[in-house]
Regions:
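PLP-dependent class I/II
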Residues: 1-171
């Protein structure tokens, strides 16, 4: 989604009093200039948006479950500050990620961590490119592989997904 398109959603949410839950887990994969890295690049987002961040996609933390939620202090719903409400709920229900996982998350933001994360993202994006190119060369209509390492295509009508998977493996 482009920044202009996202701005339309932010404007709409502010107009009708809605709250946007924005998943920014793939932020590290964004390569296009007109795609925002955070919803807070949009004017007015702090009064209508909650952003979810994860270390799973950019730093390979899939099994360790570390992420964070951004809830601006400006965000209210029905006169209630959502940041304070979330802090109370979170403090009551969750004791935090294990210390070793917190330290690993901290390392992601070090110079070496940033370098390794960038290399990992580039590796995954190259894999997506190889898959896209191979499928296109095989005559399939393919999309994706930009701003996220995923590739989509429609399987031929006469094949189940498993039959198509076998076809790809064997051809």
């Amino acid at each position: 989604i482009t920044k202009d398109q996202l701005q339309e959603w932010v404007d709409y949410a502010n107009k009708v009093g809605a709250v946007i839950i924005y998943d920014a887990a793939y932020e590290a994969y964004i390569s296009e200039d007109n795609v925002p890295h955070t919803i807070y690049e949009c004017d007015g987002a702090k009064t209508c948006a909650i952003e979810l961040r994860s270390f799973s996609k950019n730093a390979g933390f899939t099994g360790t479950r570390l992420g964070f939620t951004v809830i601006p202090k400006e965000l209210e719903s029905n006169g209630t500050k959502l940041n304070a409400l979330w802090a109370r709920r979170h403090g009551t229900k969750f004791n935090g990620a294990p210390y070793i996982i917190q330290r690993a998350g901290e390392a992601v933001y070090s110079e070496e961590g940033k370098k390794q994360t960038k290399a990992q993202v580039a590796y995954y994006m190259n894999n997506a490119k190889v898959i896209m190119d191979g499928l296109k060369n095989a005559g399939f209509s393919v999309s994706g592989g930009v701003n996220a390492p995923y590739v989509w295509l429609e399987t031929p009508k006469d094949m189940t997904s498993w039959e198509f998977f076998d076809y790809l493996l064997n051809n």
